[in-house]
Amino acid sequence: AALQVLSAPNLLRVGSNENIFVESQDHVGGPLNVKIMVKNHPTQSKELASKSVVLDQANNFQAMTQLVIQRGPLVDDPKQKQYVVLQAQFPDRLLEKVVLVSFQSGYIFIQTDKTIYTPASTVHYRVFSMTPGLEPLTREIFEDQEVAKNKEIAVSVEIMTPENITIFREIVNPDKGVKSGQFKLPDIVSFGTWHVVTRFQSTPQKTFSSEFEVKEYVLPSFEVSLTPAKAFFYVDDNDLTVDITARYLYGKEVTGTGYVVFGVITTESEKKSFPASLQRVEIKDGKGVACLKKEHITQTFPKIHDLVKQSIFVSVSVLTEGGGEMVEAEKRGIQIVTSPYSILFKRTPKYFKPGMPFDVSVYITNPDNSPAIGVEVEVTPDHAKGVTRANGFAKIPLNTVASATELVITVKTKDPGDPRQQTGGGTMKALPYRTSTKNFLHVGVDSNELKIGDPIKIDLNLGPTTIPNHDLTYMFLSRGQLVKVGRFKRQGNALVTLSVPVSKELLPSFRIVAYYHVGAADLVADSVWVDIKVSCMGSLKVTSTRPKASYEPRRAFSLTITGDPGAKVGLVAVDKGVYVLNSKHRLTQTKIWDTIEKHDTGCTAGGGADNMGVFYDAGLVFETNTAKGTGIRTDPSCPVSSRRRRAVTISDVITSMASKYHGLAKECCVDGMRDNTMGYTCDRRAQYISDGDVCVQAFLVCCTEMASKKIESKQDALLLSRSEEDDDDDAYMRSEDIVSRSQFPESWMWEDTNLPECPAQNKHCESTSVIRNNFLKDSITTWQITAISLSKTHGICVADPFEMIVLKEFFIDLKLPYSAVRNEQLEVKAILHNYSEDPIIVRVELMENGEVCSSASKKGKYRQEVNMDPMSTRVVPYVIIPMKLGLHSIEVKASVKNSGSNDGVKRDLRVVAEGVLVKKETNVLLNPVKHGGEQTSHIPSGVPRNQVPNSDADTLISVTAGEQTSVLVEQAISGDSLGSLIVQPVGCGEQNMIYMTLPVIATHYLDNTKKWEDIGLDKRNTAIKYINIGYQRQLAYRKEDGSYAAWVSRQSSTWLTAYVVKVFAMSSTLISVQENVLCTAVKWLILNTQQPDGIFNEFAPVIHAEMTGNVRGSDNDASMTAFVLIAMQEASSVCEQSVNSLPGSMAKAVAYLEKRLPHLTNPYAVAMTSYALANAGKLNKETLLKFASPQLDHWPVPGGYQYTLEATSYALLALVKVKAFEEAGPIVRWLNKQKKVGGGYGSTQSTIMVFQAVAEYWSHVKDLKDFDLNINLEVAGRASVTKWSINNKNQFHTRTDKVNSIDKDLTVKASGNGEATLSVVTLYYALPEEKDSDCESFDLSVTLTKMDKTSHEDAKESFMLTIEVLYKNSERDATMSILDIGLLTGFIVDTDDLNQLSKGRERYIEKFEMDKVLSERGSLILYLDKVSHKLEDRISFKIHRVQEVGVLQPAAVSVYEYYNQKRCVKFYHPQREGGTLSRLCLGDVCTCAEESCSMQKKGEPDVQRIDKACGAGLDYVYKATVVDSKLTTHTDTYTVKIDLVIKPGTDEGVEGKNRDFMGLAYCREALGLMQGKTYMIMGKSEDLHRVEDKGLLQYKYVLGEQTWIEYWPSQQECTSRDYREVCLGIDEFINQITTFGCPV
């Protein structure tokens, strides 16, 4: 017999192309016309899609056709599942299935140009929008023109802060599925993880998001990677080694020091270090090795077995050789194990076919969840063996016994490299496939992992069967869609082999389902799940057109992009340093497939418990004309366990350290006799000895009795420094000819390109190419170029990143902090790299910037000359003070002597105000319904007192609609108990109605609340059948006049007739109810039972009084009238036309009840009357609520619990009718808690009324979700009001506003219906709290003392540098710390002193860097094993001046713990206290004065006066008298009276007025200004500064290096011989300037 089949995915997507399959297997005869339809569920009142197909010989009586399900009446409510009815109308029968639907329109993937951003930078994003079939979402892909025309393809893009405030939103229309956009981050932002949230405009409830990080950072110049020797630590292991690799981003190896610590991450995700594991590792040529020993663990955790299943982390901080930079890395997931492997039966079916092969597919992982490769596996019962492949899988076929009732599989692993024989095991149980005919089918695939283009060899083993020839159908499913189907006829053979190539549609994995049928009832099926190697459906590759090992900055290059013809390709080039900081948020092909695989409808590895289980587990609905069909899927997602992922974080704080020394007492004595430069007592020195009492005693005895002898050593000076012009200028390239590198984008090449279609002569080409020409940026790094394509035929493809190394043989790496605080001194480092094979001499120049005080200020540049070894790195430090807010460039140029090699770097330093970013958040819940329909909220600004003056501040405002509406929607009563109400009506006219009520109210309730799945979606057809039976049976008790009684012979009952009207009116939407049947009953009630005053009387009470509720109780006149009136009201929509007297009759009844209501005493009658009046629009809510319980949640009726239920239900209906949902909520909650009896509520009336009331409530609150919320935002000082309107269509979009200040009061007014949250986030800079120092962790003091005599043969002067450091912690000493000591230019360090400090028992420093002559370093690095927290540690050594330098810049000393790079910095200088650069300050406005002193001119010839007064840049010439002076340790201020303006300058009208002139304290002697004396002062415009003081603009004069100061003798002095010539010269000069001006 033929088998007719309807099959489709068991989760259908609305609005997308879906493949539906129909066939007739073993069909004999002519063509078949089949109509496929999709209708709404449960009523099937609307057709949502349809298509007709013809099954014939040509298509093998099979057809797979595409349908697009229209949205129609479907509502995408996340809390409510939606179903459709899928039908296939064959000529002789209808096949139908209820199918769950999804509103997933497709996929959106988001690429950002980077993974991490700084404030004020620009985020570039690219949106890729696709259909579920991975085609670009365009209108062209839909066959149906009407569908295509109406298809919404727009995508909304939102940028959300870590507080989930949307601060940017736009709607984009992707072109060919791709659209780029950008967003500039504000200057003041919240740090943390931000989100790009996208959604299809057609289904805004479904979001797709991508993340990026925002923080303040500087890109590192090298990366550190950690490779453990093993992925686990076995409890019996003695050690674990970790290889450290440090490599510059441009590929060269790093030399330096690594600080390593190991620890464990506990089960509570808490990190605990092993203090004993702290170690310093030498990194040479980019490599180092760290070692964790078992005793390191057991010193902290004696019972190592307690740590099993917890994971070890290793944290490494690598400091470059010259101390120029430190980079951190961490490796996690090294599990402590008793067995090294985990065994998962990941793709092994749960069911086997007795007597047929069974494929065991095991996945073996290391403890870090990575695949374990090459592990030997043994499987019992067969003792079959296998070995895991590169993906960690091993596939082992087992033979099964035909009589087996279960299959217990045990897998054991063996590690040949491990002496412990057995390393792990796992067990699973498989059950037999259920079949009534003993027919089986086994589908086997030869490979565990395939790639596109590979042939799949599919073995179909049918085993012994009595039917020799029959059709066998196979289907391929991937990504939740039917992809291809086929069929062949079996010709008696038991094994059939198919070979099908793997096509792109099957990525990333697919299922093969095969089946045949035996006779009418048995269908035999099997399936298998097959994984495909992660790859693109098509191809995309980026290569260099002319490949090279490395490229130079700014040079031209050419890329070839090859991929799928016609694809759109998005490009971006990213500095590899970005991924060193954050590689988490990159869009990769694996991430894409992971997302898509989540939407796979199949849930198991293959097979099934029985034939329909095979289809269901594979993700299919399957219905046939003979065999039973699949169950109905009710959950869109599979019950899968989540995959654990490895996380990477920065190093955590190390809390303690341990350091032990061993030595002989004799050595201790020798050490005690050594000289000590710190001047410590013997007792204090002995505190540094940790060799035990024996050593301490020996040390003290020798120290106190012996004198020491100084040992001096010689050291050559190679550091040469000049600030003046060099004699050998010709040997260097002029700095003006060096063009500095200044373009250092972290990403660029953000562009889209289209690959050409195939050429006409080769229309089926596999790929096409395009060439892009460009110029490299200025960075020395590795650029990673990522390309992502989207093709209409091959979907989305992320190419492997293409790397371009950019490098020069000699270059500068200028290290600047992310930001610097205005007026705070800091050190920046220029790192010189020499990658040539020769030693070089380099001239380095710091260029002047007027806004930054440095040694280059007022001189144009500051020069140094340094020697460099081959293949070496050199640090040149500079001390600067930024003077103004904003971005200011720091430029360093360098050229190699007698060579063309040179480089220049110009980077911007961000100068910020003093202050800390503060964030304050306020949330206001807007729910106007709870505030009488209108809500007003005031949010005062409250300007903080500590805000930094004139600094940026922002207020971000956002409004997000709540998921719920203003009313808390109560859950409907669970439908699971209603199954027992679906019964077949029987009995007399009254009993029949009792029973008919049950399926009617169950169907009414489950239809309204969409809860059919609680009792079974297929039960609705049964319920409808029973309602029809009840209806037909009741007609037998209908009298000719339309009335009803228990028997036709009995007198008609008013109540029963009214009840029939009520139930039939309710049924009329479910079955066909004749209008005259309903309306003649209504007419009978009006004509025969209603009295002139409107009351309805009962003349023949029903026999089954229990079915009427409390209608016969007190106030029964009102109860009966209300009951009949309600029945009429419910039937009025059907009967108004045919029963003319109906409106008048209802009006009379309403009038009677209105009059009667105030006098009623029975709560039951009040509730029922209230509902009848509510239907007429005349509810008196006050009266109704008066009879409620104190909690206002139910209406107690004396005499029966069922009456209370019924009365409460009528009250609920009345309140719902007038939309009083606030009051209705507690009532539903109360009803929900009441105990049901057999699915109902004890009596007919209480059951029908409770379910009717709750259904009515639910259907109304559903409509409440139509938001209608209006919000007005008023900002103080802003003329316009911002207005937002939230409705159902736009409720998922966030509204935002921004106020560029924090001193504006906000007023929010909300009206209408709905709930929303208003969030206000205020960001501003607060003044830091007063503190003596920025040093949070250390106290540091640096003093430089000149020695009486030199102690080095080349020294011009010798100094003792003393550094005292204390760790500011009350509990512990600092662990391994680094003291970075900058050296003054022209000075060398005394290495004998350093050797003494670092050797012997009493080591004050653990190590110092002296691989080369020390003066070749920019700084001296001292490594300290600890820093005391009780007593200041002192380190003293001599430094010698061996070279005279024109301008000597201060040097910096910094100290920090290796894991916390927040440094404590102090400066030193031979002449300046605190080593500060020279500045002159008035209030908070400062001027750089880093220059030589001006000398008072004495007896200068006239010509020099004229030259000076008329020279370039000279501003003024004054005769001035000093009237006052204020002298301080740093700045001297002279108040002078301007007696005569000889040459006027910028400062107008100054004659006769006082002005302040400022000079440096150490220039006091050179200036020689005395109070009461008069001077000629000439100054340049650059020494004149305009400042605001108390609101007044005034000029401040600086006595700088270029200022002319000459004593002006008094009249009396001019008569003396000493001054006569000077006075004549001055008179001549004044005459020349005032009469003739300056010579041209």
Curated annotation (Swiss-Prot):
Renumbered residue ranges of the record's region Properdin-binding: 1420-1430
CDD domains (alphabetical): ANATO (cd00017), complement_C3_C4_C5 (cd02896), NTR_complement_C3 (cd03583)
Pfam families per UniProt: A2M, A2M_BRD, A2M_recep, ANATO, C3_CUB2, MG1, MG2, MG3
Cystine residue pairs: C536-C797, C603-C638, C668-C695, C669-C702, C682-C703, C853-C1488, C1079-C1135, C1335-C1464, C1481-C1486, C1493-C1563, C1510-C1638, C1614-C1623
PTM info: C3 precursor is first processed by the removal of 4 Arg residues, forming two chains, beta and alpha, linked by a disulfide bond. During activation of the complement systems, the alpha chain is cleaved into C3a and C3b by the C3 convertase: C3b stays linked to the beta chain, while C3a is released in the plasma. The alpha chain is cleaved by the serine protease complement C2b component of the C3 convertase to generate C3a and C3b following activation by the classical, lectin and GZMK complement systems.
SMART domains assigned: A2M, A2M_N_2, A2M_recep, ANATO, C345C, Thiol-ester_cl
All copies of domain Anaphylatoxin-like, residue ranges: 668-703
Site annotation Cleavage: residues: R722, S723, H931, G932, R1278, A1279, R1295, T1296
A GO MF label: antigen binding
Key words, A-Z: Cleavage on pair of basic residues, Complement alternate pathway, Complement pathway, Disulfide bond, Glycoprotein, Immunity, Inflammatory response, Innate immunity, Secreted, Thioester bond
Main location: secreted
Domain NTR: 1493-1638
GO CC, alphabetical: extracellular space
Glycosylation sites per record: N164
GO biological process: complement activation, alternative pathway; complement activation, classical pathway; defense response to bacterium; inflammatory response
SUPFAM superfamilies for this protein: Alpha-macroglobulin receptor domain, Anaphylotoxins (complement system), Terpenoid cyclases/Protein prenyltransferases, TIMP-like
Role summary: Precursor of non-enzymatic components of the classical, alternative, lectin and GZMK complement pathways, which consist in a cascade of proteins that leads to phagocytosis and breakdown of pathogens and signaling that strengthens the adaptive immune system.
Subunit note: In absence of complement activation, the C3 precursor is first processed by the removal of 4 Arg residues, forming two chains, beta and alpha, linked by a disulfide bond.
Alphabetical list of PANTHER family matching this protein: COMPLEMENT C3, MACROGLOBULIN / COMPLEMENT
Protein name (record): Complement C3
Gene: c3
